[in-house]
Amino acid sequence: MSDEHHSGLLYGLEQRIPPLPAFFSALQHVLAGLVGIITPPLIIGATLGLGDWLPYLISMSLLASGIGTFLQSNRVWGIGAGMICMQGTSFAFLGVTVAGGMWVKAQGGGPQDMMAMLFGVNFVAALVPVIVSRFIEPLKKIFTPIITGSVIALIGISLIKVSVINWCGGEKAEDFASMNNIALGAGTLGVIVLLSCAKNRWLRLSSVVVGIAVGCIAAGLSGQFHLHSLGDTLFRLPTLFPLGFQFNSAIFLPVALVSLVCILEAVGDLTANSLISQQSVDDRAFRNRLKGGILADGVSCMVAAMLCAFPNTTFAQNNGVIQMTGVASRYVGRYIGVILILLGLFPPVGELLRQIPAPVLGGATMVMFGCVVAAGIRIITQTPLSRRDVLIVGLAFGAGLGVESVPAFLSHFPPMVGDLFGSAATSGGLVAIALNLILPQEQAATKSLRSQDDRAES
């Protein structure tokens, strides 16, 4: 048997996979990330009064995500991590995007002026990850396992909250947390877990798809799933900068700062992806993957801005799918990219998937997001933790979970602070970086003495 099979992988990173299992695996990645891709444009569009443009924004978000995912998996000219790194619309930019749109509106601008300004600023801000990607070697002392592991674990915990809300029916559901919703999500989750533990590779490969299908059937039989109109537009052809290009430095600065913070999340996602894919996370090949992955993040954001979509980032969800299906083959990323591109070009298909009941998606994503948390913990515990490491991890989790649990903690700070520290991953990650730079390193002799004491006790 191959090393991949001993490690629990059905297909390793560089192992080619037949088309049918590749498609099933890719479809599960798409289902896991679909809601995350289309939700930010829905929120931004509703807040800024862009209702007439929402179908176009959603289609272009899917298209940009597909192009970015394709770039990440192929690693052409050094662009991309060469792994299954699904790109999707970033939630981190919601605050600064809405603030920028409101500023344009206050100056008398309409919806088209707002979007021309926002996408122009986003295009220039995408240069931040492009530039930072060239300096990964000097920054490797910052992106240590305890920092990247803490960030990825906090991302997973934040995603679990989203999963539970969907499981209950969605934030605005009239029957929120009803027994029907709980049972529907639990049934979907149960099917996925059972199939993921099966020895048959086909059952494991299709666990998420089958689980969601069973959940949809159950929802239909119980009257909780009703198909609505799929829209009148069968095909949507994109154009570059359809509304023009505008720029303002006052709007650019906060967007650039959020772009810088998002790099920290991307490093965590890429590290977890490498670990789950049975790749080293402490060699030159890994640093090249980081360099290419962050560069692809920047290029993907540029593509998104040109297409009239909001900034992209590397999604953590797909790490959970890799863990569950055992498929780490980067060639699956091509299929994911093509599926997302088709969803963007053919809106009815994406609309059909969008109508999957929220409890079904909540149950399906629960186990995936839990795997993301586990991947973060695994990164943290790669090496024995010193007292200093425990302090950094503890305070990072405290800061991240504190802000996540009580958002009002930042309510009296300037909006810029709220944008930078508003999520568990960014607040915890920035605290971890600051402590790692400030706290003195433990002396080697102290570490050695402690190791001897541990061995003596054992």
Predicted regions and their residues:
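Short juxtamembrane and helix-loop transition motifs at transmembrane-helix boundaries
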Residues: 16-24, 43-54, 72-81, 104-117, ...
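Hydrophobic transmembrane alpha-helices of multi-pass solute/ion transporters
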Residues: 6-17, 191-194, 208-259, 411-419, ...
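Membrane-embedded helical hairpins/re-entrant loop segments and their flanking transmembrane helices
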Residues: 19, 45-80, 257-330
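Short, non-helical or kinked segments that cap or interrupt transmembrane helices
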Residues: 52-57, 78-93, 141-149, 204-209, ...
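Membrane-embedded alpha-helical modules
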Residues: 102-228, 335-449
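Intrinsically disordered, low-complexity non-transmembrane regions of multi-pass membrane transporters
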Residues: 1-24, 229-240, 275-292, 438-458
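Hydrophobic, membrane-embedded alpha-helices of multi-pass small-molecule transporters
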Residues: 20-33, 177-189, 207, 222, ...
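N-terminal signal-anchor module of multipass membrane proteins
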Residues: 1-84, 95-107
